[in-house]
Curated annotation (Swiss-Prot):
Interacts with either CDK4 or CDK6 protein kinase to form a serine/threonine kinase holoenzyme complex. The cyclin subunit imparts substrate specificity to the complex. Component of the ternary complex CCND1/CDK4/CDKN1B required for nuclear translocation and modulation of CDK4-mediated kinase activity. Interacts directly with CDKN1B. Can form similar complexes with either CDKN1A or CDKN2A. Interacts with UHRF2; the interaction ubiquitinates CCND1 and appears to occur independently of phosphorylation. Interacts with USP2. There is a cross-link at residue 269 (Glycyl lysine isopeptide (Lys-Gly) (interchain with G-Cter in ubiquitin)). One of its GO terms (cellular component) is cyclin D1-CDK6 complex. One of its GO terms (molecular function) is proline-rich region binding. The modification Phosphothreonine is found at residue 286. It holds the Pfam family Cyclin_N. It is found in: Nucleus; Cytoplasm; Nucleus membrane. PROSITE patterns: CYCLINS. It comes from Rattus norvegicus. One of its GO terms (biological process) is positive regulation of cell population proliferation. Residues 269-295 are annotated as: Disordered. Regulatory component of the cyclin D1-CDK4 (DC) complex that phosphorylates and inhibits members of the retinoblastoma (RB) protein family including RB1 and regulates the cell-cycle during G(1)/S transition. Phosphorylation of RB1 allows dissociation of the transcription factor E2F from the RB/E2F complex and the subsequent transcription of E2F target genes which are responsible for the progression through the G(1) phase. Hypophosphorylates RB1 in early G(1) phase. Cyclin D-CDK4 complexes are major integrators of various mitogenenic and antimitogenic signals. Its main location: nucleus. This is G1/S-specific cyclin-D1.
Length: 295
């Protein structure tokens, strides 16, 4: 009797059906033209910030990613929040004691832009171990949006991934795997300051190629083999193939170092032994197998 009134409904997010009109070349051209308008400065650590250094950005970015993952935020929230953070730091000097406040505020605003049910100020304050108050976060929100001149609809690599996949004659199940791994690479790139200089379209294209190469989805005789895919996507985003290939190699190197760091945190002794073997064997010329990554 007590189970008769038990509610077994599961809340699902209602999503619109894919619209092919939003994936045509005209939209992509407009996105490529717009992406530069919301790009942060690549030299703000030297020219603007006095206390904040790249290692601090890495720490707060990792924390922001963990919060977004634990709250199961949309994939676009974290890269968009990092775009806000970098653009703000490109304009305004900030004390290092307020960097976590800025990170929480960027997630707060980004979730309003991309989430059906955005993160609350109170919940974000809990993730800071109550080191900030909701009132401080709301005040910082006003400062953030004013400094960004309310230009909050910035392009992120996620906006380009679907365009690239729609142009590839891959099977739907393969596209789903590529999409998932490419999204993981995009989040990983957002934590690393080296990728600030790359436009979102290049990060997205590099992530797609890196995902395909790691998953071995491109055969040598296939149009979508990694070499041809790189040239194809470089034409799509109108960039030099060598620049795109360099971005892809950066992504693969970042993935490899992240996996090594994660393994070191689990078993430091085993990592030291593996490091000695790697030094003798030299660096591998093939990228890390992305199937080893826990998505």
């Amino acid at each position: 009797m007590e189970h008769q009134l038990l509610c077994c409904e599961v809340e699902t997010i209602r999503r619109a059906y894919p619209d092919t009109n939003l994936l045509n070349d005209r939209v992509l051209r407009a996105m490529l033209k717009t992406e530069e308008t919301c790009a942060p400065s690549v030299s703000y650590f030297k020219c603007v910030q006095r206390e904040i250094v790249p290692s601090m950005r890495k720490i707060v970015a990792t924390w922001m990613l963990e919060v977004c993952e634990e709250q199961k935020c949309e994939e676009e929230v974290f890269p968009l929040a990092m775009n806000y953070l970098d653009r703000f730091l490109s304009l305004e000097p900030l004390k290092k004691s307020r960097l976590q406040l800025l990170g929480a505020t960027c997630m707060f605003v980004a979730s309003k832009m991309k989430e059906t049910i955005p993160l609350t100020a109170e919940k974000l304050c809990i993730y800071t171990d109550n080191s900030i108050r909701p009132e401080e976060l709301l005040q910082m929100e006003l400062l953030l949006v004013n400094k960004l001149k309310w230009n909050l609809a910035a392009m992120t690599p996620h906006d380009f991934i679907e365009h690239f996949l729609s142009k590839m004659p891959e099977a739907d199940e393969n596209k789903q795997i590529i999409r998932k791994h490419a999204q993981t690479f995009v989040a990983l790139c957002a934590t690393d300051v080296k990728f600030i200089s790359n436009p979102p379209s290049m990060v997205a294209a590099g992530s797609v190629v890196a995902a395909m190469q790691g998953l071995n989805l491109g055969s040598p005789n296939n149009f979508l083999s990694c070499y041809r895919t790189t040239h194809f996507l470089s034409r799509v985003i109108k960039c030099d193939p060598d620049c795109l290939r360099a971005c892809q190699e950066q992504i693969e190197a970042l993935l490899e170092s992240s996996l090594r760091q994660a393994q070191q945190n689990i078993d430091p002794k085993a990592t030291e032994e593996e490091g000695e073997v790697e030094e003798e064997a030299g660096l591998a010329c093939t990228p890390t197998d992305v199937r080893d990554v826990d998505i």
